[in-house]
Curated annotation (Swiss-Prot):
Positions annotated to bind alpha-D-glucose 1-phosphate: 99, 164, 179-180, 197
InterPro entries (UniProt xref): ADP-Glc_PPase, ADP_Glu_pyroP_CS, GlgC_bac, GlmU/GlgC-like_hexapep, NTP_transferase_dom, Nucleotide-diphossugar_trans, Trimer_LpxA-like_sf
NCBIfam families, per the entry: glgC (TIGR02091), PRK00725.1 (NF001947), PRK00844.1 (NF002023)
Biological process terms in GO annotation: glycogen biosynthetic process
EC number, UniProt record: 2.7.7.27
Record-given protein name: Glucose-1-phosphate adenylyltransferase
HAMAP family listed in its UniProt record: GlgC (MF_00624)
Pathway(s) where this gene product acts: Glycan biosynthesis; glycogen biosynthesis
Family: Belongs to the bacterial/plant glucose-1-phosphate adenylyltransferase family.
PANTHER family given in the database record: GLUCOSE-1-PHOSPHATE ADENYLYLTRANSFERASE (PTHR43523:SF2), GLUCOSE-1-PHOSPHATE ADENYLYLTRANSFERASE-RELATED (PTHR43523)
Keyword flag Transmembrane helix: no
Length: 404
């Protein structure tokens, strides 16, 4: 039997996430709560761990305390077996400076690669919502002989201009790479679809080391994986695409096969939550064969009293809904909603309190927000714009710990 390749996972988790403000005012983007019981980073870590890639370094930088704590408390593996998920803050090994880009983050962390000496390196982002079996991508990478493999998701050409786009030939070899093009290239088998980069890469170790070193010496580089490293390897004929549509995740439904969402804006973050709440959700959190991990808490079950109800909603542990109505919403843990309150089409994060007779519609309430009795959020957008953040799509976002 062929010995399994030695794979090191590196997760790029230093994103500031300015477009998600106020949710990122006090935390890194990958630490933002999602789905009633998780954080964004839990999706990539679950994919890697479910695929049995159990040596993972998480590179952090921006306001990383809550992210570091979450990983340390909820992602403990067996150190005796050489398994680990470890947060690695910017080490400043090359002087008193932070990472200047994702490729520079790898360059400043090269000691991790040298210490582990892997055959292949999986480099994934930390702020997307999806399920994927990365082992299948690794196998294609090995069989293709490419130096780098980029995960691509098929999107309509009319929507592809927001992404880094991949022009591949029939064999999957990447012959062109364009950031946010006005005229995106079609896929080899469908001219109306485009391969958009998912920000997930697999490298043969020597190829990555050589490319990162060369990039570090280039004063004109922005030191970005997608903007500099991949185009360099494409120019050298060393990069191929992995079609995400071919990834088969155990337990996936027909509706959520191939699901992937970039939640980099408030509207996208909100919409991804609404994908969770229907009877047959677009993204199914309840796939026991490929579970999303990292969200366990020692809390009592949710409770509904005095006729409180929740319809087409996700309700986190420890929450109490008393004589209140919740519809089409995602509630995290330890949420309390008092008599007569109405919550519709909203994302409610841990520890939120919604008072008697209050109304919350089309809103995102960050941790520990308190909505007083009779107060309204998402009902009068002109009033909300004076005190909160309102997205282009009309989603009202209230920052952590605000009292209304």
């Amino acid at each position: 039997m062929r010995e399994a390749p030695h794979v090191l996972g590196i997760v790029l988790a230093g994103g500031e996430g300015k477009r998600l403000y106020p949710l990122t005012a006090d935390r890194a983007k990958p630490a933002v709560p999602f789905g009633g019981g998780y954080r964004l980073i839990d999706f990539v870590l679950s994919n890697l761990v479910n695929a049995r890639f159990l040596r993972i370094c998480v590179l952090t930088q921006y306001k990383s305390h809550s992210l570091d704590r979450h990983i340390s408390q909820n992602w403990r593996l067996s150190g005796l077996a050489g398994e680990y998920i470890t947060p690695v803050p910017a080490q400043q090994r090359l002087g008193p400076r932070w990472y200047t880009g994702s490729a520079d983050a790898i360059y400043q962390s090269m000691n991790l690669i040298y210490d582990e000496d892997p055959d292949y390196i999986v480099i994934f982002g930390a702020d997307h919502v999806y399920r994927m079996d990365p082992e299948q991508m690794v196998q294609q990478h090995i069989e293709s002989g490419a130096g780098a493999t980029v995960a691509g998701i098929r999107v309509p050409r009319s929507e592809a201009s927001a992404f880094g786009c991949i022009d591949a030939d029939d064999s999957g070899r990447i012959r062109g790479w364009v950031e946010k093009p006005a005229d995106p290239p079609g896929t080899p088998d469908d001219p109306e679809m485009t391969f958009a980069s998912m920000g997930n890469y697999i490298f043969t170790t020597k190829v990555l080391i050589d490319a990162i070193r060369a990039d570090a010496e280039d004063d004109d580089s922005d030191h970005d994986m997608g903007g500099d490293i991949i185009p360099r390897l494409v120019a050298d004929g060393m990069a191929s695409v992995y079609d995400f549509n071919n990834n088969e995740v155990p337990g996936a439904t027909e509706r959520d096969h191939g699901y992937w969402r970039d939640v980099g804006t408030l509207d996208a973050f909100y919409d991804a939550h609404m994908d969770l709440v229907s009877v047959h959700p677009i993204f199914n959190l309840y796939n026991k064969r490929w579970p999303i991990r990292g969200g366990a808490e020692n809390l009592a079950p949710a409770k509904f009293v005095n006729g409180g109800s929740a319809q087409e909603s996700v309700v986190g542990a420890g929450s109490i809904i008393s004589a209140a109505s919740v519809r089409n919403s995602v509630l995290s843990s330890n949420v309390a909603i008092d008599d007569g309150a109405i919550v519709e089409g909203s994302v409610i994060m841990p520890g939120v309190r919604i008072g008697r007779g209050a109304v919350v519609r089309h809103a995102i309430l960050d941790k520990n927000v308190v909505v007083g009795p009779g107060e309204m959020v998402g009902v009068d957008l002109d009033k909300d714009r004076e005190r909160f953040t309102v997205s282009a799509g009309g989603v009202v976002a209230v920052g952590k710990g605000v009292w209304i």
